[in-house]
UniProtKB/Swiss-Prot annotation:
It comes from Hydrogenovibrio crunogenus (strain DSM 25203 / XCL-2) (Thiomicrospira crunogena). It catalyses: tRNA(Ala) + L-alanine + ATP = L-alanyl-tRNA(Ala) + AMP + diphosphate. It comes from the Bacteria. This is Alanine--tRNA ligase. Zn(2+) binds at H553, H557, C655, H659. PANTHER family: ALANINE--TRNA LIGASE, CYTOPLASMIC, ALANYL-TRNA SYNTHETASE. Residues 828-847 are annotated as: Disordered. The keyword Transit peptide does not apply. Belongs to the class-II aminoacyl-tRNA synthetase family. The lineage of its organism: Bacteria, Pseudomonadati, Pseudomonadota, Gammaproteobacteria, Thiotrichales.
């Protein structure tokens, strides 16, 4: 039974039992920014199990793509050394949300395995939690499982919990017995870690709610969460003891064998490569790109581990990305998103492979030298850190090599080196830092800026030079804290508001507003009179600047959505800056964006602006926001209540910034630049509204000037330029022909200037007006004509000297063109080289050329 047939059989079986088939969620969990990767089928149903989300069905089934690499669940170091560890696997699951419970879950599992798949009952072993008498009775008394193939286990293996508190409950696991010829004992026995009994299905019964004191309270509606590894089940059904021998892996292993030249399909490095292409490809599909932090670094580690295993097999050229088409053939039907993103996956992996290839060989030499000089069995932390810092070797890659040599790595020493580097970085970043905007204040400010541009407020505190004062007078710079404010404080990439605090003839100009804890710091200067603590003032923001910031912030959301639409869902925000004058957006992408793509992105943003969709801003609890589809950034800390900014069907994000009410208020949107700022990170800068109109006016003015210079009308500029380009190419062609004729005639004249030196015809001369191509053509003619010959020809263009040297092949044993041209080039401030019969060089001192050419005869005399 193929893996594809198993997927279908599983889903079909549970759909017949009233379950709704739910497509796999991404390997990047959209509902849990604290979780590195989706590592189980239940992750996409987490809110449903917690009662924070309701679905239109109470029974679900899925085939979930999962990753276990990095974080709590990390199988990376075992991949390639065991039969069943993978960084990527597929989990078959069926779920009950307060519907059926233990009896039905056990019946479904047993029926599917023994009847649908036809597995012999005597090959299956059952475990239950030692205190779960209910599950025990169902298995032994109702299902008729033999007590000889049944065991009770402790909480370590058979009690599941979502965390220290919350839903939890006992598990029942189903194992497959691979036979007495395989080492290992049954679950619960001293030798249970062998390969004879392999867990294939885990049935989790969410039965209790664990409180902080450890008390277990029965849930009013218990649920079921089950998970079965497709790869393990396929190994059973295909009569294999090693997952890498199933159909899903064999096609990839064979392709890796073809690319590396390794013929042994059981080679552990081939298996590592086959496993790693699966996890790497699906990470890119779901928006992860190689980087030096978070998920991106996990991806980088896995890619580089795969490349190192290819290098171990003798493959020094890039190869890893070439496995993607084979993977698509195997898994594209089950995961259409893989087909859609194939080109992006190939490009991202190829770029990372090319980047690492530049340092891999040198890094391996350093490591080999260190290993050769080891007096013990531990690679030092300093060596591991040097490989990491200089050559891009993740620690686990170095540990992988060490493991193959029965060595280990001083990980504690490596961490000491890392911490020392972090300390240096902190010191550098804090150098000269000022804390002038840090004040001793623990109160709070009520923000009313979403609704109001101005409001009366009371001055709660004033700080001058970080010292709390009762009063500030004209000319003094100060920080003012109010009890409430319409001023937006700098956060989320949006700059703080500017404006004024006034009362009668007293005025304080606010240059910026920042947040410290729950307090808003109004930073500025007293411009008239004085201000005092307890004084009631009118706080008024610069409305024009605020509206411009709102336009740019809303445009940033539309830009983010447009980038994901045009470039792919791997695009994720890496940073942003929203000012009244412009916006800047940093995002993950693996290559420069083409002019055509930039135009498409700009048009898509403007299209959504012109739709004039209402911008809905709503506060809701975090789980409701996630359920609505709002994007949550990995690593961001969100409170229980978040603000959701919804722009029609095009964009929905969590955001605390200020925005327009309708997208049409943004006005025109223009991209002004696109650039790369780091590996895998691009930056777009853009303007909106009046600033965008200004760029259009400037371009229009420039076009008018160009048209005037070309003596044509605006509509004809493009065709006129094309005409001029064509004419220029024709003129260049004619010039080249004339230069060739001139050089040829000069060459004919030069033939009479040949001097014979030790039987060799020597010629060294300058050709006026010649380029390098003309020098070569002339050289070829003269070399054939003057056989045996040693010739140097030169040309001068400004302060640059071009040199070519040619030597007849019959004399290259003694007279070599590369050495000859280098002899001349060194005298004119340059260098060069090439083949024994043909070489080229350059120089930057034309004043020495005549003398250098004169030295050729003497040089030939010494070698010929």
């Amino acid at each position: 039974m193929t893996s594809a047939e198993l997927r279908k059989a599983f889903l079909d079986f549970f759909v017949k039992q009233g379950h709704t088939a739910v497509h796999s969620s991404p390997v990047v969990p959209g509902n849990d920014p604290t979780l590195l990767f989706t590592n189980a089928g239940m992750v996409q149903f987490k809110e449903t199990f917690l009662g924070q989300e309701t679905r239109e069905y109470k029974r679900a089934t899925s085939v979930q793509r999962c990753i276990r690499a990095g974080g709590k669940h990390n199988d990376l170091e075992n991949v390639g050394y065991t039969a069943r560890h993978h960084t990527f696997f597929e989990m078959l699951g069926n779920f009950s949300f307060g519907d059926y419970f233990k009896r039905e879950a056990i019946q479904y599992a047993w029926t599917f395995l023994t009847e649908e798949l036809g597995l012999p009952e005597e090959k299956l072993w059952i475990t239950v939690f030692e205190e779960d008498r209910e599950a025990e009775d169902i298995w032994l008394k109702e299902m008729g499982v033999s007590a000889e193939r049944f065991s009770r286990c402790g909480a370590k293996d058979n009690f599941w919990s979502m965390g220290d508190t919350g839903p939890c409950g006992p598990c029942s696991e189903i194992f497959y017995d691979h036979g007495a010829d395989v080492a290992g004992g049954p679950p619960g026995s001293p030798d249970e870690d062998g390969d004879r009994y392999i867990e294939i299905w885990n049935l989790v019964f969410m039965q209790f709610d664990r409180s902080e004191d450890g008390t277990l309270t029965p849930l009013p509606k218990p649920s079921v969460d089950t998970g079965m590894g497709l790869e393990r089940l396929a190994a059973v059904m295909q009569n294999q003891h090693n997952n890498y021998d199933i159909d899903l892996f064999q096609a990839i292993v064979k392709k890796a064998s073809e690319l590396t030249g390794e013929k042994d399909l059981a080679n552990s490095s081939l298996r590592v490569i086959a496993d790693h292409i699966r996890s790497c490809a699906f990470m890119v599909v779901d928006g992860v790109l190689p980087s030096n932090e978070g998920r991106g670094y996990v991806l980088r580690r896995i890619i580089r581990r795969a490349i190192r295993h290819g290098y171990k097999l003798g493959q020094t050229d890039i190869f890893f990305y070439q496995l993607v088409p084979t993977l698509v053939e195997q898994m594209g039907e089950a995961y259409p998103e893989l087909v859609k993103e194939q080109a992006n996956v190939e490009r991202a992996l190829k770029l990372e492979e090319e980047r690492f290839a530049e340092t891999l060989e040198n890094g391996m030499k350093i490591l080999e030298e260190d290993i050769a000089q080891l007096s013990g069995s531990v690679i030092s932390g300093s060596t591991a850190f040097k490989l990491y810092d200089t050559y891009g070797f993740p620690l686990d890659l170095t540990a992988d090599v060490a493991r193959e040599r029965n060595l280990s790595v001083d990980e504690a020493g490596f961490e000491q080196e890392m911490e020392a580097q972090r300390a240096r970085a902190r010191s550098a970043s804090n150098f000269g830092a000022q804390s002038k905007n840090k004040v001793d204040y623990t109160g709070s400010t009520h923000f009313i800026g979403y609704e109001q541009d101005e409001a009366e407020a009371e001055i709660a505190a004033i700080f001058v030079d970080n010292v709390s004062v009762e009063k500030a007078s004209e000319g003094q710079e100060a920080i003012v804290i109010l009890n409430q404010t319409p001023f937006y404080a700098e956060s989320g990439g949006q700059v703080g508001d500017q404006g004024s605090l006034t009362e009668g003839m007293n005025s304080f100009h606010v240059d910026n507003c920042q947040k410290q804890g729950a307090a808003f710091l109004h930073i500025g200067k007293v411009t008239a009179g004085s201000i005092s603590v307890g004084q009631t003032i009118l706080a008024h923001i610069d409305v024009k600047a605020r509206r411009a910031s709102e336009r740019n912030h809303s445009a940033t959301h539309l830009l983010h959505a447009a980038l994901r639409t045009v470039l792919g869902t791997h695009v994720g925000q890496k940073g942003s800056l929203v000012q009244p004058e412009r916006l800047r957006f940093d995002f993950s992408h693996f290559e420069p964006i083409s002019a055509e793509q930039l135009l498409e992105i700009e048009q898509l943003v403007n299209h959504n602006i012109m739709l004039n969709a209402q911008v809905m801003m709503e506060e809701m609890d975090i789980e409701a926001a996630k359920a609505k589809g709002a994007m949550a950034l990995f690593g961001e800390k969100y409170g229980d209540v978040v603000r959701v900014v919804d722009m029609g069907d095009f964009s929905i994000e969590l955001c605390g910034g200020t925005h327009v009410n309708w997208t049409g208020e943004i006005g025109p949107f223009r991209i002004t630049s696109e650039s790369g700022i780091a590996s895998g990170v691009r930056r777009i800068e853009a303007v909106t509204g009046e600033a965008a109109w200004q760029t259009i006016y400037d371009m229009e003015k420039s076009l008018l000037n160009i048209a005037a210079n070309l003596k044509t009308d605006k509509p004809q500029v493009e065709s006129k330029v094309a005409q001029l380009v064509t004419e220029q190419k024709e003129l260049e062609k004619q010039l080249k022909q004339l230069q060739s004729k001139l050089a040829s005639s000069q060459g004919d004249d030069l033939a009479s200037s040949v001097t014979e030196v030790n039987g060799v015809n020597v010629l060294a001369a300058e050709l006026e007006g010649a380029d390098v191509n003309t020098l070569r053509e002339t050289l070829d003619k003269l070399r054939d004509k003057l056989e045996p010959a040693a010739i140097v020809l030169a040309a001068v263009d400004g302060d640059k000297v071009s040199l070519v040297a040619g030597v007849s092949k019959s004399i290259t044993g003694n007279v070599k063109a590369g050495e000859l041209v280098n002899h001349v080039a060194q005298q004119v401030g340059g260098k060069g080289g090439g083949r024994p019969d043909m070489a080229q060089a350059g120089g930057k001192d034309p004043s020495k050329l005549k003398e250098a050419l004169a030295s050729v005869k003497e040089w030939v005399a010494t070698v010929a």
